[in-house]
Structure formats: C-alpha cells, structure tokens
Amino acid sequence: IGIYGLNFALMHFGDDIARMESSVQLTDTGVDGMETITIHYRDGRMAVLTHSIYCRGDRKGIIHGEKGYIVVENINNPQSVSVYDATDKLLQYHEVPRQISGYEYEFQEAARCIREGKTEADSMPWDRTIQLMEIMDSLRKAWGVIYPQER
C-alpha cells in the first residue's frame, strides 16, 4: 500500500539509500494493512513513511529542513503546496489545479508519450519504476508477504 509514499520520498530525497527499517501489521488475508517505513540516506537524511488501510490519514507529505518545511496536501492527488519557515510562518502557497481522480496527470503523460512516439515517460522512467518495485519486493520479503504466483 505504500507505493505513493515511497515514490514521494524518492522523488524528493533521491535513491542513495543506506538502509531501510519497517514494521507491518498484516490483514487476515496476509497483505500489508498498516506499515511504517524508515528510509535512512547515506548523507544523514531520513524519510519516515506511514500507510494504513484501517483508517483515513491526512495523506500529507511533509519535508522538514533546518530552515523550515514544506507541506504537500494529498500526495496521491496533490491539492496544494505550502512552504513555511522555521517559525511556522507561511512563505509561499501554491494551489494545484483540481483533478477528478488524481490519475489525470498519468493519463496526460501517457497520451503525450504516445503522441511523441515515446515508449518511456521522462517523468517516471523505467529504472525508477523497477527501483520502486524492488524496494516493495524487499519490504514484502521482510514482512513474509508472498504473492500466490511466487509460491
């Protein structure tokens, strides 16, 4: 369930990962129902991700730094981005054009690629997709989550 959170972390912090830690609560059917993932980067930065199907979270992405922080409202379907200084003073606010489902940007990018004869999107190249799949696979392995076709 954590693909959007993982992608958000990699988009903003990159992929120079030193290690990951995680904990999970599996559902009765054996899939991840709730998880916490901590990504430790080689340069000392850290991303902490939480995901759950049991309750509705705020879906915010918050990036903290020494001089302030950035809040992205709804990382699945961004609505706005707010930039604050270290005293919580709002410095910038950007509203994102409203979408119906949040998938419009994916459809628009696919349509653009088709029109231009591209087989790979610059915004989400295959190597990033494979990297995210490998991270998800390593988390599933650590949690003991095995898909039926993997047995």
Predicted feature residues:
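Short beta-strand-to-turn element immediately C-terminal to the catalytic PLP-Schiff-base lysine
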Residues: H64, Y84-D85
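C-terminal helix-rich "cap/oligomerization" subdomain common to oxidoreductases
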Residues: R42, E109-R151
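Contiguous beta-strand/loop segments that form the cofactor/metal-binding neighborhood of enzyme cores
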Residues: I3-P78, P97, Q108-E116, E150
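Active-site loop of classical SDR/Rossmann-like NAD(P)-dependent oxidoreductases
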Residues: V96-Q108, M124
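A generic structural signal for residues located within well-ordered alpha-helices
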Residues: I1-Y4, Y105, R128
